[in-house]
């Protein structure tokens, strides 16, 4: 999904550019003047807060509005008017992105990027990087598992969940690990509004519409969330014990649901603060980070790609200053904590 409901100004600005990019995808990604369809559904994000979390939610909304995001605060009465299917028990406040928030088809997004890159002359090589070769204070080449050596003027680490392992090849510490996340597809017996926004309950459980059904998930508690290098098994107990009780309480129509499908994938999880690590390495001149987005990678990729381009081309940020996301904070152990993580 794409949203602006963050607590850090840079993340909000990244989200604003992200939605502009998605809504104008044909302008940015078209090849041979073909229309680019990303399956964009602009149905909004609805964050719900208990009494304990309402101050933070309100403060976040003020910052989001200052940045130009279209986010409205709703008290329980207005929540019930706008979303009559919602149980407001235990909810003190909600914030709703009424414009510029929604979701898209990630495979269409990836394929559109790939097609545009190829049209502009990019070459894709398939393989695993097994060695990074340095000469003085620069990366000179990488070696693939096939034995092929690829020279480089710049190396951008955009290895997703395996970014930490790639950085280690250059003897760089990067606290990014794979964390398994599971999405469950649902069919609801009771007829419910097919344009359900992405609802984030105060419990952390989220659910949204998907086609004629719904999808839901949650970031599991720490003791159920180990680093996951090769485990892609779907844990149905997570749905039964945590997700279903929460969504059935918040949206009573979900008391009678059937799990129709489920799948697992990886977050590139930054263990320091769940925020991106962006920009050059302080000592290796041509090594750049685009890592650790902890589930926000798709929506943040347009702005991050532009930022890395600016650094390589101009030696500085020209649009959004992302200096606070530098690798220096990792070295110093200074967390830049985002309060709106899904």
Give the role of each language-model region.
Residues 97-103, 203, 293-298:
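Glycine-rich "substrate-gating" loop/helix at the edge of Rossmann-like oxidoreductase active sites
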Residues 146-196:
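Central helical "cap/lid" subdomain
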Residues 40-42, 124-125, 175-181, 252-264, ...:
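A short coil-to-beta-strand element that immediately follows conserved catalytic motifs
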Residues 106, 245-342:
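C-terminal catalytic lobe of FAD-dependent flavoproteins
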Residues 1-82, 204-206:
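Dinucleotide-binding Rossmann-like beta1-alpha1 core, especially the glycine-rich loop
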Residues 173, 187-286:
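Active-site lid/adjacent beta-loop-alpha segment flanking the redox-cofactor pocket in flavoenzymes
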Residues 13-14, 47-56, 96-116, 231-239:
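Short beta-strand to alpha-helix junction loop
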Residues 96-154:
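Helical element adjacent to the flavin cofactor pocket in flavoenzyme catalytic cores
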């Amino acid at each position: 999904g794409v949203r602006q409901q963050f607590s850090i100004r840079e993340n909000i600005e990244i989200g604003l550019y992200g939605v502009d990019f998605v809504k104008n995808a044909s302008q940015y990604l078209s090849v041979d003047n073909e229309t680019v369809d990303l399956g964009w559904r602009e149905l909004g994000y609805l964050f719900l807060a208990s009494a304990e979390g309402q101050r933070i939610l309100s403060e976040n909304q003020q910052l989001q509005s200052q940045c130009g995001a279209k986010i409205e605060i709703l008290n329980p009465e207005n929540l019930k008017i706008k979303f009559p299917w919602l149980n407001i028990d235990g909810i003190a406040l909600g914030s709703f992105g009424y414009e510029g928030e929604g979701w898209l088809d990630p495979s269409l997004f990836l394929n559109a990027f790939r097609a545009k890159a190829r049209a502009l002359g990019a070459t894709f090589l398939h393989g695993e990087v097994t060695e990074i070769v340095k000469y003085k204070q620069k990366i000179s080449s990488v070696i693939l598992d096939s034995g092929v050596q690829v020279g480089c003027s710049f190396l951008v680490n955009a290895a997703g969940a395996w970014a930490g392992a790639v950085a280690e090849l250059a003897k760089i510490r990067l606290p990014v690990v794979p964390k398994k996340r599971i999405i469950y597809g649902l069919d609801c017996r009771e007829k419910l509004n097919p344009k359900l926004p992405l609802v984030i309950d105060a419990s952390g459980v989220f659910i949204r519409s998907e086609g004629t059904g719904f999808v839901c998930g949650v970031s599991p508690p720490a003791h159920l969330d180990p680093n996951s290098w090769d485990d892609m098994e779907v844990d149905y107990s997570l749905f039964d014990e945590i997700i279903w009780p929460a969504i059935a309480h918040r949206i009573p129509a979900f008391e009678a649901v059937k799990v129709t499908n489920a799948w697992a994938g990886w977050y590139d999880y930054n263990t320091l603060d769940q925020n991106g690590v962006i920009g050059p390495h302080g000592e290796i001149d041509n090594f750049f980070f685009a890592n650790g987005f902890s589930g926000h990678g798709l929506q943040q990729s347009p702005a991050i790609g532009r930022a890395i381009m600016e650094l390589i081309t101009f030696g500085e940020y020209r649009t959004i200053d992302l200096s606070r996301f530098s690798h220096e904070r990792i070295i110093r152990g200074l967390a830049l904590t985002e309060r709106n993580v899904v």
